[in-house]
UniProtKB/Swiss-Prot annotation:
Signal peptide segment: none
Pfam family, one: Thioredoxin
Family note: Belongs to the IIV-6 196R family.
CDD domains tied to this protein: TRX_family
Superkingdom: Viruses
Protein's organism: Invertebrate iridescent virus 6
Protein name: Uncharacterized protein 196R
Length: 174
């Protein structure tokens, strides 16, 4: 039986990246799902786009092999959003969808929020993830940096106004 995972702050831990070249690296916010892939949606109570996305996200449960589907309501878990700010995956807007490999964030979804696009994203990223898992040179801390938000989209709800004008635009809902 498959079901949606409802996660909270206790389901996440901070991890130090491996040392390399004396560079100061950000911490990694990991989830505790360590035996598979996971697709996690960070949402908020006052985000109408999150509410529109939830039924689509729920349809994915049990349909993607070796991938657990979960959600975190950052309105109920503000400490988690705050904790994430100094990590490789800061939660600066919702909805935010991240793909994890054995609990480590790997890729942020940046496409249109449709069921087909989410499935295609997981399929493509899973293929890349399997390649990485089999590659011993891959360091745990060498995940891609996730950049967020220019105020070019009216289809996301920024958690901090100051962050609404930095970085790259968030994904669209078209």
């Amino acid at each position: 039986m498959s079901f949606m995972l409802y996660l909270d702050k206790a389901d996440f831990i901070l991890s130090q990246p491996p040392p390399s070249n004396n560079q100061e690296k950000k911490k990694i916010l990991k989830n505790r799902i360590t035996n598979s892939f996971s697709l996690i949606m960070f949402s908020g109570n006052n985000c109408t786009y999150c509410q529109e996305l939830k039924p689509i996200f729920k349809k994915l449960v049990g349909t993607i092999p070796n991938c657990q589907i979960g959600t975190v309501n950052v309105s109920l878990q503000p400490e988690l959003a705050e904790l994430s700010q100094q990590t490789t995956t800061p939660i600066r807007y919702v909805p935010l969808i991240l793909f994890y490999i054995n609990g480590t964030p790997f890729k942020e979804f940046g496409g249109n929020y449709t069921e087909d696009n989410l499935r295609q994203f997981v399929k493509e990223v899973s293929i890349k993830a399997y390649e990485i898992i089999g590659t011993p040179q891959q360091e745990e801390g060498s995940i891609s940096q996730h950049s967020v938000g220019k105020a070019v989209s009216k289809r996301v709800c920024y958690l901090n106004f100051d962050n609404a004008y930095n970085g790259t635009p968030p994904p669209s809902f078209d």
